[in-house]
Regions:
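Rossmann-like dinucleotide/phosphate-binding beta-alpha-beta segment
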Residues: 42-138
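Short gly/ser/thr-rich secondary-structure transition/capping motifs
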Residues: 32-38, 87-95, 122-125, 150, ...
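Oxidoreductase and adenylate-handling cofactor-binding alpha/beta cores
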Residues: 11-27, 70-71, 230-243
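Phosphate/diphosphate ligand-binding glycine-rich loop within oxidoreductases
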Residues: 1-32, 44-45, 142
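Mid-domain beta-loop-alpha active-site segment that forms a flexible
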Residues: 5-13, 59, 65, 220-236
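Short, charged, surface-exposed secondary-structure boundary motifs
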Residues: 8-12, 85-89, 177-181, 223-224
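Rossmann-like dinucleotide-binding domain for NAD(H)/NADP(H)
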Residues: 139, 146-257
Length: 257
């Protein structure tokens, strides 16, 4: 498929954020300034006493699941398509309900595709609401590598300040167009989520909190760039083969006028 080029890259980005948040990378890096070794907070060791929950187990989510298992964690997964995916993955994924997913977990990784259609059973704007995350039975690390709209920043920041979230790693933001424009002086941080996103970004950059951010670049590996270039050439060839009217596989985020 023409959409497979970045599966491993995005999955590895999720694991990078897991290591940063669990390892409290900002604090440990800043401690080097004075070579402080006595007052550091203990980091979260990844082992089989810790549980991670993966939300959304398509190709990328499945790879995230595998990498978390390879790091010694207990892993569970939440996906509305669990029945069909369980068969597809030969019963190798521990699927649980949405309610079970948040309980007794230490690390939450969002890998769901965004569905904005309210009538769809897959609708997930605001899925990780403050109310849902408060059902966690212990403080969690929160990782998001697909779409910011699924996990509004204002709720994440509030829960972090309340000690319910221990660290945030995100490659995505709720309104990336407005956020980018505001960051570049062409707009205002005029919503709770934009203000929270700015605070998370600022504190990630000055290393004052356990926050780690990227500007939607989780797919940007060296290998993925090569694979995407190959896919682009194949796509162009298909276009001309079909008389400039269609591709063999129409990607959902491209529309033909």
């Amino acid at each position: 498929s023409l959409r497979n080029y970045c599966v491993n890259a995005v999955a590895q980005t999720a694991i990078k954020f897991v290591y940063c948040t669990c390892g409290m990378l900002n604090q440990y890096t800043k401690n080097t300034l004075t070579f402080e070794r006595n007052k550091a907070t203990s980091f979260m060791e990844l082992n089989d006493s810790r549980t991670a929950t993966v939300y959304g187990v398509g190709k990328i989510g499945k790879r995230v699941y595998e990498l978390l298992e390879a790091n010694g964690l207990k892993v569970k997964a939440v996906d509305l398509r669990a029945k069909e995916l369980d068969k597809l993955y030969n019963h190798t994924v521990n699927f649980v309900s949405k309610e079970e997913g948040i309980k007794d977990t230490d690390i939450v990784v969002n890998v769901m595709n965004l569905t904005r259609i309210k009538e769809s059973p897959l609708y997930n704007v605001g899925y990780f609401s403050k109310e849902y995350l408060l059902q966690a039975t212990r403080p969690i690390e929160f990782i998001n590598v697909t779409r910011g709209d699924i996990a509004p920043e204002s709720g994440l920041l509030e829960l972090y300040k309340e000690g319910k979230i221990l660290g945030i790693g995100t490659d995505v933001f709720t309104d990336e167009t407005a956020f980018s424009e505001a960051l570049n002086g062409r707009g205002e941080f005029n919503t709770p989520d934009l203000k929270a996103a700015k605070e998370i970004m600022d504190k990630a950059l000055d290393r004052s909190e356990n926050f780690y951010v990227q500007p939607h670049q989780g797919f940007n590996s060296d290998r993925a760039a090569v694979e995407k270039a190959k896919d682009a050439i194949i796509h162009v060839c298909e276009w001309y083969k079909n008389g400039g009217k269609k591709f063999d596989e129409q990607l959902p985020y491209y529309t033909l006028k």
